[in-house]
């Protein structure tokens, strides 16, 4: 893979991983576009390309850790405090908010995995169908537009329960389909469940950490089984990782800015325009 392609793919992953417009759809569309014009890059289903996509996803994981470092440190500290109190005295010392949130997050990831593994074959068919990608982009835009019409939400993380965690986990599972944005689905359904915008965002992006880690593990196993990594460009992997992480920090801060101001409909117009371009054949894809 040429370094300029690694930079381009890293930029796209970094921008669209957090903007609620589906990073997977953009990566798929860009990869098809590059291949259709005979640019030097591996096939999307090759072990090398799967590994590259895995690495840039880990890069965006670094973005989350950097942006939410204070909150993550607080969460880790108090979760360990809750766990220590339970191990030492057989009970929690005070309300176990952080331990409870940890368990709810794991529940969300569990339901994401159930949906993802159950519908994996269906989602893979969408990857090869630009018309289906266009449809899911239209749906993403509709959800974003509707979200800005919601009245102010009142629930905080203390009021988050099993039902909310399950709903968000299922929504994230369906977001594995190209065109359905992970951040959009989790934030929208968090708001639908009554969470305040700030907490819907924080839960969404905190949830991305174990989700990306689990997906990385599964993809690493797949890459190992495929083999054929002798031609992998380490320079391209490092470049994609660094670019995705750096661009992801800016992208994440941008989406938080718009979310807190109830302006997600800005992104709905973009995904509708992209869907229209696909349907009208303005984006020529070799499918």
UniProtKB/Swiss-Prot annotation:
A single GO molecular function term of this UniProt record: undecaprenyl-diphosphatase activity
Gene, per the UniProt record: uppP
Location(s), subcellular: Cell inner membrane
Domain of life, source organism: Bacteria
The keyword DNA-binding is annotated on this UniProt entry: no
Record-stated family: Belongs to the UppP family.
Name of the protein described by the UniProt record: Undecaprenyl-diphosphatase
UniProt miscellaneous comment: Bacitracin is thought to be involved in the inhibition of peptidoglycan synthesis by sequestering undecaprenyl diphosphate, thereby reducing the pool of lipid carrier available.
Membrane-spanning segments: 1-21, 49-69, 101-121, 126-146, 160-180, 203-223, 232-252, 267-287
Pfam family, one: BacA
Role played: Catalyzes the dephosphorylation of undecaprenyl diphosphate (UPP). Confers resistance to bacitracin.
Main location: membrane
Cellular-component GO terms for this entry: plasma membrane
Keyword Transport: no
Residue pairs linked by disulfide bridges in the UniProt entry: none
Catalytic activity of the protein: di-trans,octa-cis-undecaprenyl diphosphate + H2O = di-trans,octa-cis-undecaprenyl phosphate + phosphate + H(+)
UniProt membrane topology term: Multi-pass membrane protein
GO BP field: cell wall organization; peptidoglycan biosynthetic process; regulation of cell shape; response to antibiotic
Record's keyword terms, sorted: Antibiotic resistance, Cell inner membrane, Cell membrane, Cell shape, Cell wall biogenesis/degradation, Hydrolase, Membrane, Peptidoglycan synthesis, Transmembrane, Transmembrane helix
Coiled coil regions in record: none
EC number: 3.6.1.27
PANTHER family found in the cross-reference section: UNDECAPRENYL-DIPHOSPHATASE
């Amino acid at each position: 893979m040429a370094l300029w392609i690694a930079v381009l793919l890293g930029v796209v992953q970094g921008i669209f991983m957090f903007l609620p417009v589906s990073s997977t759809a953009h990566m798929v569309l860009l990869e098809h576009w590059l291949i259709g014009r005979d640019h030097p890059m591996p096939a999307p289903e090759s072990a090398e390309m799967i590994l590259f996509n895995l690495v840039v996803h880990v890069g965006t994981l670094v973005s989350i850790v950097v942006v939410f470092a204070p909150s993550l440190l607080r969460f880790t500290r108090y979760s360990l405090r809750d766990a220590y109190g339970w191990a030492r005295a057989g009970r929690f010392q005070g309300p176990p908010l952080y331990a409870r949130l940890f368990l709810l997050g794991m529940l969300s990831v569990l339901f994401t995995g159930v949906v993802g593994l159950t519908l994996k074959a269906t989602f893979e068919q969408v990857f090869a169908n630009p018309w289906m990608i266009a449809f899911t982009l239209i749906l993403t835009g509709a959800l974003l537009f509707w979200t800005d019409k919601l009245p102010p939400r009142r629930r905080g993380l203390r009021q988050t329960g099993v039902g909310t965690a399950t709903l968000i986990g299922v929504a994230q599972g369906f977001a594995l389909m190209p065109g359905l944005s992970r951040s959009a689905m989790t934030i929208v359904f968090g708001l639908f469940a009554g969470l305040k915008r700030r907490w819907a965002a924080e839960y969404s992006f905190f949830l991305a950490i174990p989700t990306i880690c689990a997906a990385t593990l599964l993809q690493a196993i797949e890459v190992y089984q495929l083999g054929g990594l002798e031609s992998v460009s380490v320079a391209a992997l490092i470049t994609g990782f660094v670019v995705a992480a750096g661009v992801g920090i800016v992208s994440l801060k941008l989406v938080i800015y718009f979310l807190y101001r109830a302006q997600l409909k800005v992104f709905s117009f973009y995904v509708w325009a992209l869907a229209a371009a696909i349907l009208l054949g303005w984006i020529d894809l070799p499918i």
